[in-house]
């Protein structure tokens, strides 16, 4: 709430902040009230002892004081828990209760003095031990309470509180001139107050001119940021809790919407179809990513001995102590003669820690050339090393580790980059621009780079490349230093880890993408804060505080992990509150900082995100997240994402662990992901053994009206689907009625191989899925890592699940169960070395061989009735045999086996589907977009290989409505393929991290109008012999892969 006004002065504490202090004092005074009551009325005192009589009189008076304190504190607790953060009317009487409590405190002070007098007179002479101990306890307790109150008053004292109250009163009287004067006095007073706080914060440091300037700039920045802002520190804490809940609610609402392209949120960032994952299957991309991980070690080493001991608290101290030579120890040579160390401590701990860091990582080919431990405002420590393995000279700059570094961080105004030819157009963070200029000047004065490139001419150090790295403050300084050094070193590269968000202007940011690679981990706070980002954060914080109706203590308590409770009001309530309470502080939401140039993070950003499991209670063990690497947009880091990890994920060793986990997930999940992908498209997997067992199914009694083909999978859990790898393939044909003629559809289907029937039957399942259900939406963060593989298949698939036994499809199959024939192939042994194309081609040839070597009567089994073929179908076969059929083998009855494999040419349907699977899972190292993979069209050819009756109006209406009604078609799965395996950290493609199943349901690809989607698509013409076209071909829905 706004600061409470007591004694006509504003204080930096709210009336709703007194709940916990009042509860603490109430419990303390209640305890003493009980103890003193027992001592006074439960014990018998000697009437001849003067000390005992004085104790009784003093105790009775103190009982009355304790009772008054308890009543006043109960009133404070009751009032503090009323109202909301900015709804202060129920707490208006708080100041009068405080007046009463302060009066009681004065009486307590007097009684504490009396207690000290009693102790000095009777403590040694009094024989009553109980009286002495009780009096001593009361006096100590009184003085502790009095000192606590005095310290609290000093902490919450606002030097500008009197001016603030006058300014608010003058605003109400609309005196413009006096308002301007009071506002100016208020800003000056706040700047002076902030400057005093900074000096107290850095009380042990020597003040220089540059440091004094930094004090002034930062003080005015804070004064401008908090000017006219009547909130207290606890309000900011409650606002962060509310803002986090609002952000999570917005993300869930976006995922629940049907008309958007956002598929999921990873680490708070939206994942769309255009999200680009790092293609770690590409050798060049993998080398580049490993290079990023490698140079993170140099950035980590720049922090010296504090970070070394933080990473290795047990043995790190012993390893440093063995190499250290303190000023009291005899000097001994510790470094090579060519190493320069500037302003290290007497033991040389920083330089030794840097060297030990590389030795522990087995990087013995790294030589340290220069180490500067000089630390001041705008002067950041750094070191220069030569890496003979990589043939690079590395400049590593330390991040924020001292209060002086914090002053450099906070000096965030825009400053022109001192680069020739770009005066005024390239801007950067002022503190880091000055730090980069200092390092460049130091390198030139000490000729450090000349020493590094001439370190060992025999190894060719003269031709080594230059690398600049840094983390946090060092990352921003390294990026700007790269601008300054690039004219002399055109091949320079820079790796900036967790760089600040307000670093470069837009023009400079675009240019930095040529040589700067930045890394951001998860919800890191630093890459998302700059002056422009803080303005938006300030407005959001004030807005969420105004909309809240709950007491502050409930909001803060509800933020604990084990008591999740959303305190956001409902939307209807929010609108009414916003309109009725806006007058309370009309200027707060309209106040903005001085016009600041938007600044962005540098370079090409690798954003390491993770699919975090669902939060569990504090008593449950949390699952490990799965990490992925995507290419981030510099302008997307414009909002602070409130999270408990926003500070933790900025630590340098945490960033290094995140980078390494991406590689670990990739290495562990590379084989498992391909196996899982094959299980998802199991209709294309047919056992490669030459034996195919046809089993006769029970014949239906009803009239045969075949409507399609279904793949029958076991109803067990998908987790056990790969167990069937060694079983034999079994196919069953069903739907041939005894004593009846087969329809032309069944006759045509009997002449086709089972694989082609499986592929072409997908169209009917898709139509059934469109009618039966809509794909559910789900957030990524709601899925655990262990179930992400199966969620990818069973919960998210919309296309292939239709031919794998989805619940909605089973309802369709049960209605027409008597008119279907089933194929139940076993899943073959999962061999990652076999691509889907190899399996498809072999399976296609195998199925042709089985059909041609065995007549249909044998397939139906003994005792079965051979159906008569319609005259139209027989005529088509004769025409195909005469016409040659377009490139098929010369004889259908002759199939050659070469090296144990079938040598027949596969059908175009299988070839096309194989290319579709290969491009989908990137088995041939191809990269294409989702829009180029799928297209669902309605052919205009009047004939079809499978004659069907004209489509019903309802089916045609579904196809047409699907082009214009997005809600009719389930959205693509809100999951990326990288989580298909719990330990997998890779995506199936750099451009589409999604499964193919969900995308098949998208009837309107981006960039195609509904008319184009309904345009004609010619049926394939190059069919093998024996697969001719039927003259009665109708329009049907087919799937084609471009």
UniProtKB/Swiss-Prot annotation:
Post-translational modification: Phosphorylated at Ser-782 and Ser-808 by CAMK2A; phosphorylation by CAMK2A inhibits diacylglycerol lipase activity.
Catalytic activity: a 1,2-diacyl-sn-glycerol + H2O = a 2-acylglycerol + a fatty acid + H(+); 1-octadecanoyl-2-(5Z,8Z,11Z,14Z-eicosatetraenoyl)-sn-glycerol + H2O = 2-(5Z,8Z,11Z,14Z-eicosatetraenoyl)-glycerol + octadecanoate + H(+); 1,2-di-(9Z-octadecenoyl)-sn-glycerol + H2O = 2-(9Z-octadecenoyl)-glycerol + (9Z)-octadecenoate + H(+); 1-(9Z-octadecenoyl)-2-(5Z,8Z,11Z,14Z-eicosatetraenoyl)-sn-glycerol + H2O = 2-(5Z,8Z,11Z,14Z-eicosatetraenoyl)-glycerol + (9Z)-octadecenoate + H(+)
Residues that carry a glycan: 133
Main location class: membrane
InterPro entries linked to this entry: AB_hydrolase_fold, DAG_Lipase-Related, Fungal_lipase-type
Entry superkingdom: Eukaryota
Chain ranges on the Extracellular side, renumbered to this chain: 44-60, 123-136
Phosphothreonine, modified sites: 1023
Cofactor(s) required for function per UniProt: Ca(2+)
Record's function text: Serine hydrolase that hydrolyzes arachidonic acid-esterified diacylglycerols (DAGs) to produce the principal endocannabinoid, 2-arachidonoylglycerol (2-AG). Preferentially hydrolyzes sn-1 fatty acids from diacylglycerols (DAG) that contain arachidonic acid (AA) esterified at the sn-2 position to biosynthesize 2-AG. Has negligible activity against other lipids including monoacylglycerols and phospholipids. Plays a key role in regulating 2-AG signaling in the central nervous system (CNS). Regulates 2-AG involved in retrograde suppression at central synapses.
Associated pathology: Spinocerebellar ataxia 20: Spinocerebellar ataxia is a clinically and genetically heterogeneous group of cerebellar disorders. Patients show progressive incoordination of gait and often poor coordination of hands, speech and eye movements, due to degeneration of the cerebellum with variable involvement of the brainstem and spinal cord. SCA20 is an autosomal dominant, adult-onset form characterized by dysarthria due to spasmodic dysphonia followed by slowly progressive ataxia.
Stated name of the protein: Diacylglycerol lipase-alpha
Species for this entry: Homo sapiens
Lineage of source species: Eukaryota, Metazoa, Chordata, Craniata, Vertebrata
Gene behind this protein: DAGLA
């Amino acid at each position: 709430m706004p600061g409470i006004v007591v004694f006509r002065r504003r204080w930096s504490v709210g009336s709703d902040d007194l709940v916990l202090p009042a509860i603490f004092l109430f419990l303390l005074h209640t305890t003493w009230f009980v103890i003193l009551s027992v001592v006074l009325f439960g014990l018998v005192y000697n009437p001849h002892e003067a000390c005992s009589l004085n104790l009784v009189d003093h105790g009775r008076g103190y009982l009355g004081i304790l009772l008054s304190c308890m009543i006043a504190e109960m009133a404070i607790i009751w009032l503090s828990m009323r109202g909301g953060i900015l709804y202060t009317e129920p707490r208006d009487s708080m100041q009068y209760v405080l007046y009463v409590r302060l009066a009681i405190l004065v009486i307590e002070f007097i009684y504490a003095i009396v207690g000290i007098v009693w102790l000095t007179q009777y403590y040694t002479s009094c024989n009553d031990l109980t009286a002495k101990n009780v009096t001593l306890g009361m006096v100590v307790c009184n003085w502790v309470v009095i000192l606590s109150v005095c310290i609290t008053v000093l902490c919450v004292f606002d030097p500008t509180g009197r001016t603030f109250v006058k300014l608010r009163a003058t605003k109400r009287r609309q005196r413009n001139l006096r308002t301007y004067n009071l506002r100016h006095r208020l800003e000056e007073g706040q700047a002076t107050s902030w400057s005093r706080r900074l000096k107290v914060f850095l009380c042990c440091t020597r003040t220089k001119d540059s440091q004094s300037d930094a004090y002034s700039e930062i003080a005015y920045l804070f004064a401008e940021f908090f000017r006219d802002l009547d909130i207290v520190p606890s309000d900011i804490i409650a606002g962060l809790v509310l803002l986090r809940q609002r952000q999570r609610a917005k993300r869930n609402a976006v995922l629940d919407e049907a008309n958007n392209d956002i598929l999921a949120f990873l680490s708070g960032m939206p994942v769309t179809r255009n999200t680009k994952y790092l293609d770690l299957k590409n050798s060049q991309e993998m080398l580049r990513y490993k290079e990023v991980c490698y140079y993170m070690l140099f950035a980590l080493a720049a922090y010296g001995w504090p970070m070394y001991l933080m990473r290795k608290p047990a043995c790190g101290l012993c390893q440093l102590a063995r190499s250290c030579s303190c000023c009291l120890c005899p000097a001994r040579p510790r470094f090579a003669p060519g190493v320069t160390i500037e302003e290290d401590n007497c033991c040389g701990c920083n330089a030794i820690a840097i060297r030990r860091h590389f030795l522990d990582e087995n990087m013995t080919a790294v030589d340290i050339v220069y180490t500067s431990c000089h630390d001041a405002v705008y002067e950041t420590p750094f070191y220069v090393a030569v890496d003979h393995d990589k043939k690079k000279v590395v400049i590593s700059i330390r991040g924020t580790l001292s209060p002086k570094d914090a002053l450099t961080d906070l000096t965030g105004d825009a400053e022109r980059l001192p680069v020739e030819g770009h005066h005024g157009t390239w801007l950067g963070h002022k503190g880091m621009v000055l730090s980069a200029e200092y390092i460049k000047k130091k390198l030139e004065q000490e000729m450090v780079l000349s020493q590094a490139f001439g370190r060992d001419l025999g190894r060719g150090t003269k031709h080594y490349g230059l690398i600049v790295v840094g983390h946090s403050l060092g990352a921003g300084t390294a990026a700007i230093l790269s601008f300054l050094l690039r004219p002399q070193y055109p091949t320079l590269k820079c790796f900036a880890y967790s760089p600040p968000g307000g670093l470069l202007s837009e023009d400079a940011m675009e240019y930095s993408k040529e040589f700067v690679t930045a890394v951001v981990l998860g919800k890191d706070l630093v890459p998302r804060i700059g002056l422009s980002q803080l303005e938006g954060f300030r407005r959001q914080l004030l807005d969420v505080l105004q909309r809240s109706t709950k007491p502050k203590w409930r909001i803060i308590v509800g933020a604990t992990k084990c008591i999740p409770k959303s305190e956001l009001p409902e939307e209807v309530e929010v609108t009414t509150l916003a309109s009725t309470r806006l007058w309370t502080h009309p200027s707060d939401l309209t106040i903005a900082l001085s016009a600041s140039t938007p600044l962005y993070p540098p370079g090409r950003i690798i954003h390491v995100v993770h699919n975090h499991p669902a939060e569990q209670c504090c008593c449950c063990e949390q699952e490990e997240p799965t990490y992925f690497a995507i290419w981030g947009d510099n302008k997307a880091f414009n909002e602070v994402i409130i999270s408990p990890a926003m500070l933790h994920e900025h630590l340098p060793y945490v960033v290094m662990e995140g980078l390494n986990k991406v590689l670990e997930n990739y290495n562990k999940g590379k084989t498992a992901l391909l196996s899982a992908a094959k299980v998802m498209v199991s209709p294309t997997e047919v056992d490669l053994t030459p034996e195919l067992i046809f089993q006769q199914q029970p014949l239906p009694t009803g009239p045969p009206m075949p409507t399609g083909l279904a793949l029958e999978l076991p109803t067990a859990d998908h987790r056990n689907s790969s167990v069937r790898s060694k079983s034999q393939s079994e196919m069953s044909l069903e739907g041939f009625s005894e004593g009846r003629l087969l329809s032309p559809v069944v006759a045509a289907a009997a002449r086709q191989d089972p694989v082609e029937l499986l592929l072409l039957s997908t169209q009917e399942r898709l139509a059934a899925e469109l009618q039966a259900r809509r794909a559910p939406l789900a957030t990524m963060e709601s899925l655990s890592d262990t179930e992400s593989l199966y969620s990818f298949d069973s919960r998210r698939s919309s296309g292939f699940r239709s031919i794998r036994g989805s619940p909605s499809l089973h309802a369709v199959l049960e209605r027409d169960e008597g008119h279907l024939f089933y194929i139940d192939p076993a899943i073959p042994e999962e061999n990652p070395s076999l691509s889907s194309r190899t399996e498809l081609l072999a399976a296609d040839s195998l199925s042709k061989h089985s059909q041609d070597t065995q007549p249909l009567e044998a397939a139906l089994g003994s005792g079965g009735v051979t159906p008569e073929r319609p005259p139209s179908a027989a005529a088509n076969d004769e025409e195909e045999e005469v016409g040659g059929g377009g490139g098929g083998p010369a004889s259908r009855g002759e199939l050659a086996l070469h090296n144990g494999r079938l040598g027949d040419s596969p059908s175009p349907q299988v070839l096309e589907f194989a290319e579709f699977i290969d491009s989908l899972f990137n088995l041939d190292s191809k990269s294409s977009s989702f829009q180029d993979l799928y297209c669902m069209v309605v052919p205009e050819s009047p004939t079809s290989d499978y004659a069907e009756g004209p489509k019903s109006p309802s089916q045609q209406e579904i196809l047409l409505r699907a082009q214009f009604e997005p809600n009719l078609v389930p959205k693509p799965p809100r999951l990326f393929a990288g989580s298909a395996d719990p330990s997998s950290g890779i995506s199936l493609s750099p451009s589409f991290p999604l499964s193919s199943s969900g995308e098949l349901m998208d009837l309107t690809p981006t960039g195609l109008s509904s008319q184009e989607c309904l345009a004609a698509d010619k049926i394939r013409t190059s069919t093998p012999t024996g697969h001719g076209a039927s003259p009665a071909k109708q329009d049907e829905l087919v799937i084609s892969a471009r």
